[in-house]
Amino acid sequence: MKSFKIISLLLAILFLASCQTNTASDDEALETVEVMLDWYPNAVHTFLYVAIENGYFAEEGLDVDIVFPTNPTDPIQLTASGAIPLALSYQPDVILARSKDLPVVSVASVVRSPLNHVMFLAEQDFDSPADLVGLTVGYPGIPVNEPILKTMVEAAGGDYEQVHLMDVGFELGASIVSGRADAVVGTYINHEYPVLKHEGHDISYFNPVDYGVPEYDELVLISNEAYVEESGEVLAAFWRAALKGYEWMVENPDEALNVLLTNQDEANFPLIQEVEEESLSILLEKMENPNGPFGGQDAESWEEVISWLDAHDWLEQPVVAEDAFSSITD
């Protein structure tokens, strides 16, 4: 009887050790992939958090680690250097970066039309972007905002050279509320606008597409040329999981938003539920691809944005559309 107990105990120990070994092996099998957001976590990132929470990345053998930028230019700079394999950025910024020989590549479209609007307190009573001449416009230091603002001011008949542009970092809404800036560009219709409304401010805005700016992709997933060439299977696996997260978000928007709110960085970037609800309702339409799968890209869109930037002398050297993006959605 005593021998039986000893054998049973040994078998139990071996079983537990086997379980622990299998768990460790499973964890070791996952490849860690860092993804840098374009901003702090908000509704546009919901599909990524859903893919993590629902285990879609793990099913593809990936352990996805979401990191935040310390300043608005980090996604482009750190991806170009290879310090970060994946990041969220903006279609025009990818083109501007490539014109400076930075080896960044868009691998998927996330938001298919501009969210970026010029915003100001309604009491300013501006009629068009031409009214910004002689005034101070805040922006987050992201290069794409300059050609956007220049195009808008000139389309409205104003002299862009007489607009004072001031880098306010992430303090976009605060800069117009405090009076530090008369208006801001780089503010999003799905984020700063509902946030400022929630805070009790009456806000007006100009949509860039009404003033000569093309319908560019607001948000794209970027990588660098070397990673795209060497890690194509990882990128494909990443997007398969991201697509599942997106589809689940579309079918279950309320539950998906709860996933985001549960995973928010409340200490540093607290989210407001009603703001994120309004934001997600705006985003769902703008993220949908009517001509193919979520994330799909085409040369025509890239050529249009390249032509716009080139026409306004923002490109340091020519950019070939086909070199600026690589499809991982097929």
From Swiss-Prot:
Q: Which residues form the signal peptide?
A: 1-18
Give residues with lipid attachment (S-diacylglycerol cysteine): 19
Q: Name one GO biological process term.
A: thiamine biosynthetic process
InterPro entries for this protein? NMT1/THI5, SsuA/THI5
Q: Which family does it belong to?
A: Belongs to the NMT1 family.
* Transport recorded as keyword: yes
Protein name in the entry:
Formylaminopyrimidine-binding protein
Positions binding substrate in this chain are 38-39, 90, 145, 188, 192
Q: Which UniProt keywords apply?
A: Cell membrane, Lipoprotein, Membrane, Palmitate, Signal, Transport
A Pfam family the protein falls into: NMT1
Gene, per the UniProt record:
thiY
How does this protein lie in the membrane? Lipid-anchor
Q: Which organism is it from?
A: Halalkalibacterium halodurans (strain ATCC BAA-125 / DSM 18197 / FERM 7344 / JCM 9153 / C-125)
- For the lipid attachment N-palmitoyl cysteine, which residues are annotated? 19
> One GO term of the cellular component aspect?
plasma membrane
